[in-house]
């Protein structure tokens, strides 16, 4: 390999001297290069199988013309790689096989040729392509493409790669790995891929040796049996074991275990046999384990909870001949055990000891050696058959010694033995008497009962508890762990521990130590440990580290070639040391496969490693980060994906208690789909009808609630055959006031109107007295009656899917019906009438009327069938509150007619004339009377709460509203988690909450609190409210009510809670559905939306399914097999064809530019292979063809055919912001970044993408790029206008500002102006703020004059478009360009896709800004408080800022790159830039 350089597009270019290659004709060279490159790619990616597209050399096309596998002259191959195969031999085999005669034959490598159907997009399936065509920048690349050009003396190879599939680090390693492979092939030696190293010697020393300094010599006993004997001799009367009201001292434990050991030795003289232990949690379990150990045998736990088939297999496979059990389990054991098994109970032992006790010591004096077998644990096998893991005494002793010394197990420790004994993790609980601990034996099945578990922790004053994260979460959910004051240690293991769970645990138990443990059964219980620090965990990763290896344990993280990986790189974890098991019982084949010779140990040492199958990486501090299972690594959507990484990301969501991810093949298409199962955390994500909820409260994908809302199921239905008298009321068409009343009374979920003050809340709560001229109901005309009844009807709008009402209804189901009972009113016949709200009609249901002449009464009926499909609990409560909402609306409306309402005594009413269905509820009635009649609210207690700093003059806390003032009663408030999950985002946006409690018990109290909310909602103050919780008469109080009673210290009567904030006029007068989006999405959809904000698209689940409970295995882990059997209905990705002429026109241009035959109108431009050059060409073509004036940045706001066509079709064009969203995802505050000269943001896209999804990234396009824009005259004006733009998006700081090249000056000026305005700038990053040094002597002495006669200016202008000052075309530019016209012609000649208007506009921006600089005095006046980081490019001159001191209150951080001014924003230079930035931003403790 002669050299490595960079292509104009900055892809790696390799030049290979033909004379140094073993083959000399081009066809043989092509195969040689292909096989060597494929090996190199396999080595750096760890892929052991790849699909490769080999473009036939032009000279051999005719030889292949008849082969049916060839498509478009491409040979599609499936290549497998064996890291142990000699490199030279592999290359020879491939070259021999890749001929028309041999390609379809079997071969030693297992390679094959693929037959592709027409449905396969040819280029999309390849991991690697070898092409003889030159690279074309506009063509998308799916993975890695090598373009080969043959010269007389050399081959020139240009590598184009997809950064989403190959990291820049991998591409930087590729040439060197390729060089090593070709060198090995040339020597024709025996080297394999395992001999090709990827890390240097220093890193190798670090990960192999420095991180494995765990040697520890233990003094004293050599077995745990000897440790127990020693303990019994030194502390005979100390309590060792407790079960219910029974106890064993150490002396008793040793004696009873010794008695069993004597009896076992009498039955069986051979040692190291498996003795089964078939017992329930009890003292017998403890004496059984120790008795078997003292007998010199190995115990085999046989849990009575296990299926009989599993137990039978374990007995057969282990060849067990003796089983210890309890008397009451004897018959059950005999029924499942094979013939010849000897069953031992305490009765047998007691009988034996009565005969021999006088002649026997406390325990047999067996010579138990460290290498003897201690126990056998059966663990699940991949074949479905469990496998027995053999653990020796020295391994157990090492574990117990480490627990005693490092974790602190001693005589003060009280352990709850609750883990089922058949699991590896239970063994240290059972064997802990060897450390002097007291063991409390848990009740059978206690590990499945969190409430009972907490009771035992408290009763027995347990100090140390072990549990899987799933159980830990369940214990926290009891909210009773604080009742366990003795608890000082919690060990978590068995599953990945998430940060939010660790934080919740330590916040609940601040004096308790939390230790994360890890270890496969094959390596003796716990192999690594991580003590969770309450402070640093907040800044740590979402999934906690599994820690560092324990004493006498070695961790190796290796790639697929069994070579160590660098810190931070992913590999498979191999474990060595004292904990490694002997192997699998009677499974020599599997033992040889999983227990390998330690390649890092001296030859002949006998040391072995266990291959865990777990994926992990080293942290800089020597701890290990677990990343999932190797068998959970799948190739999905072209990407290699860790299912555990996706699960871990989902579990960081605060609503998620547990998650699991599986891949399922679509039965229709055969494609793989990613399915995520989620169990919600009920404490953080409460559901309506919690515990009795339907699936629609978890997901609204089926739109069941919306369909009910549209069906008007709350209306009364009459049989067609007996249709009663129906009157069409006047006033069906609402007037403007009625529409305004209906649409301004919303359940507001957004608060865009600004801050709320204490005075605003007092004004809201102080309802003015209503004054109006009183009238009697009999004075109403039919027109007036129709007019005010219209307020009870439906309102519709072209902007809404759902109908609108003037009053609130739970679930917007409007299940409360209104009936009028009238006598002598509006000329109508006396009787009862149903008001039909959809058609604005009165339907007579009875000609009876109990009211006196001239009277009007309203009756309310709840139609339960309209609400029961959605709500299961509190149906009567919400219907009564809806009745209150209607009456509250009438309180506001009727005074305009001289009327008011008063509640009737429900007990005195007869609903018989209404002829309601038996299943419906009669709710009550109110009389319409003369004059305004607002209730006094004397029986209501009103409270206000504020949270956060939302109200400046009202500190956080809960207040009681008393006589027009607010009195502070508590600092505590109803928190976000106390409102149902789908409303929590509204809570975060709100400014305050109001609680209303009625002193009137029963249903009348619910009417009153509902009436109060409705009147408050209809306020004229632009304050919006949303109901967020209520009490229950039927025992189903919502969390907000329970929390409020905690704050008060007692329960109230009927209770209602709502939150609110200030709304804008636009919200108030809107007839749209923005506030009603909650009906469209449930927790499943909202979680998926949240995941999309920080998870790459290829990792997004196709389906998120919420389960009431995760299925669990017996040891508390998620049962993946049970999940795989759950039926999941999948939505299929369909191609949406253009639906109108405009979409057809846009699609045609789109397909032509992206070179795609099949596309959907919802396909994303950038995800479909679009880049900057294609974007320019596409927009130019659209503008020319459609006579439009689309700005370039429109593709960021409308990146699909569908959205772009909709944008074009709007009569009024929405202005496209110069704030260009380059990376929208992230939970942190955004980054605002200015591009270089010319002001076009497209070259910042790769930077935005490489930084990841932690925070959004916005580029700020220069004013002047779009047509009809004029560049700003000064930097000061540019910054001022850009600040206006930024503040529209983020009103207040702290701000993060970046600037590249010339953009660094604008970023600096913007930071200064923001600080001048009192804002905080958190960070200012200046990327390559200096100009590139111009090496040509004609331009080296450049000046700042923007003139085409100035070679320096022309060079920089050229670089704006070409991205280089060394391109060969620069010389021609300097020679031929004399003015703007000739420059525009020159650039568009080089790149015809560029529109001359765009080139001209960018040129003028460069001309305007080229001369911008600060004077000395201007810089002297500008001193920033913000921390400044300067990242210098290789070869740049000093920047404007480095020549001046004092521009920053604190010294700036200056970092230098190897990449130059232009390559730092391209691959692979971008990798160096982002690495430097991420290193700089890392917390000091994590930087190693």
UniProtKB/Swiss-Prot annotation:
<dbReference type="InterPro" id="IPR020845">
    <property type="entry name" value="AMP-binding_CS"/>
</dbReference>
<dbReference type="InterPro" id="IPR020806">
    <property type="entry name" value="PKS_PP-bd"/>
</dbReference>
<keyword id="KW-0596">Phosphopantetheine</keyword>
<comment type="pathway">
    <text>Pigment biosynthesis.</text>
</comment>
<protein>
    <recommendedName>
        <fullName>Indigoidine synthase</fullName>
        <ecNumber>4.3.3.9</ecNumber>
    </recommendedName>
</protein>
<feature type="region of interest" description="Adenylation">
    <location>
        <begin position="229"/>
        <end position="585"/>
    </location>
</feature>
<feature type="modified residue" description="O-(pantetheine 4'-phosphoryl)serine">
    <location>
        <position position="1172"/>
    </location>
</feature>
<dbReference type="Pfam" id="PF00550">
    <property type="entry name" value="PP-binding"/>
</dbReference>
<dbReference type="GO" id="GO:0016491">
    <property type="term" value="F:oxidoreductase activity"/>
</dbReference>
<dbReference type="InterPro" id="IPR000415">
    <property type="entry name" value="Nitroreductase-like"/>
</dbReference>
<dbReference type="InterPro" id="IPR045851">
    <property type="entry name" value="AMP-bd_C_sf"/>
</dbReference>
<dbReference type="Pfam" id="PF00975">
    <property type="entry name" value="Thioesterase"/>
</dbReference>
<dbReference type="Pfam" id="PF00501">
    <property type="entry name" value="AMP-binding"/>
</dbReference>
<keyword id="KW-0456">Lyase</keyword>
<dbReference type="InterPro" id="IPR009081">
    <property type="entry name" value="PP-bd_ACP"/>
</dbReference>
<keyword id="KW-0597">Phosphoprotein</keyword>
<dbReference type="InterPro" id="IPR000873">
    <property type="entry name" value="AMP-dep_synth/lig_dom"/>
</dbReference>
<feature type="region of interest" description="Thioesterase">
    <location>
        <begin position="1230"/>
        <end position="1346"/>
    </location>
</feature>
<dbReference type="InterPro" id="IPR029058">
    <property type="entry name" value="AB_hydrolase_fold"/>
</dbReference>
<dbReference type="GO" id="GO:0016829">
    <property type="term" value="F:lyase activity"/>
</dbReference>
<dbReference type="GO" id="GO:0031177">
    <property type="term" value="F:phosphopantetheine binding"/>
</dbReference>
<dbReference type="InterPro" id="IPR010071">
    <property type="entry name" value="AA_adenyl_dom"/>
</dbReference>
<dbReference type="InterPro" id="IPR036736">
    <property type="entry name" value="ACP-like_sf"/>
</dbReference>
<comment type="similarity">
    <text>Belongs to the ATP-dependent AMP-binding enzyme family.</text>
</comment>
<comment type="function">
    <text>Nonribosomal peptide synthetase involved in the biosynthesis of the blue pigment indigoidine, which is implicated in pathogenicity and protection from oxidative stress. Catalyzes the synthesis of the blue pigment using L-Gln as a substrate. Two glutamine molecules are cyclized and oxidized to form indigoidine.</text>
</comment>
<dbReference type="GO" id="GO:0044550">
    <property type="term" value="P:secondary metabolite biosynthetic process"/>
</dbReference>
<dbReference type="GO" id="GO:0005737">
    <property type="term" value="C:cytoplasm"/>
</dbReference>
<dbReference type="GO" id="GO:0043041">
    <property type="term" value="P:amino acid activation for nonribosomal peptide biosynthetic process"/>
</dbReference>
<dbReference type="InterPro" id="IPR001031">
    <property type="entry name" value="Thioesterase"/>
</dbReference>
<feature type="domain" description="Carrier">
    <location>
        <begin position="1137"/>
        <end position="1212"/>
    </location>
</feature>
